[in-house]
Amino acid sequence: MATFSKLSERKRSTFIKYSREIRQSVQYDREAQIVKFNYHLKRPHELKDVLDKTFAPIVFEVSSTKKVESMVELAAKMDKVEGKGGHNAVAEEITKIVRADDIWTLLSGVEVTIQKRAFKRSLRAELKYVLITSFFNCSRHSDLKNADPTKFELVKNRYLNRVLRVLVCETKTRKPRYIYFFPVNKKTDPLIALHDLFSEAEPVPKSRASHQKTDQEWQMLRDSLLTNYDRFIATHAKQAVFGIKHGPKSHLGRHLMSSYLSHTNHGQWVSPFGNWSAGKDTVESNVARAKYVHIQADIPDELFAFLSQYYIQTPSGDFELIDSSEQPTTFINNLSTQEDISKSYGTWTQVVGQDVLEYVHSYAMGKLGIRK
């Protein structure tokens, strides 16, 4: 019996779309024993050959719905990609941003745009959360969305005392990873983004396909936010990198972080932190490689020291405070009360652990300077 070539994974939505094409086009001639249908495939004759051998004497006629482009059309498309869009343009623009040390300017600029243009407070908090957390975790939007808010925990850190992390079980390759939150000596701060999300939005009941079995009851973000975010950035953000046709919007953070770490001679941290699969320990390209997998790996304390902007790496490789008067634990001197936390975070208090909410709220009140 004939066998198919190695199977490849497809998104559920893609599978449903292709199945619909078959159902809507299938025809069967009983007398001639011929089955006809359309399918989204570049080389339908390969599928036909396998089906003919497998189900003989039935003969299959498979027509492709995939558009066949002429050489003229392909040449025109390549000219367009070379001139304005594509991975090369994205790589060049991100390299420019990283080398000019404009990452913080870009992030704060987009944050200001969100503050001015997103009029609904919950949407404003969600958009900022995606912008900031995707960068500081070199993360996909889907990982941010699928994080389980009941799985937050505080872990010890040699330089920052403690960092916060939340577990993501449902990832692209079904291998768990963590999303991290830690003090950053900039206005763009993942802990403040998390505080704003807790304050303005609500936990979302876990969405699942009918075939999925999971005990997870909640997720951090709503499913439709990816579309909202990409549309908002495309409409309102004026930075050059967002003007590239088919360029990254919600995925920009992971490209920026991978390039930032590589440019600052910390490329060995890209794969374990961002879960990139590059075939090497170090990602050399400024835009991380196309293959992307999740791996559970211990993230070194030094990475968070570097990203916090409180520390600088010495020639010997150690990390020391940039300014001894500025400590990453400065803003958690006074703990928030249960009443303050409940008033600020509402429904999240029923989902997230008390110690986690206390840490986030205390930090935010201290850094934002609004503690009584």
UniProtKB/Swiss-Prot annotation:
The active site is at 292 (o-(3'-phospho-dna)-tyrosine intermediate). Keywords: DNA integration, DNA recombination, Plasmid. InterPro entries: DNA_brk_join_enz, Integrase-like_cat_sf, Recombinase_Flp_C, Recombinase_Flp_N. Gene3D superfamilies: Intergrase catalytic core. The keyword Signal does not apply. Residues 85-367 form the Tyr recombinase Flp-type domain. GO terms for molecular function: DNA binding. GO terms for biological process: DNA integration; DNA recombination. SUPFAM superfamilies: DNA breaking-rejoining enzymes (SSF56349). Belongs to the 'phage' integrase family. Catalyzes the recombination between the large inverted repetitions of the plasmid. This is Recombinase Flp protein. It comes from Lachancea fermentati.
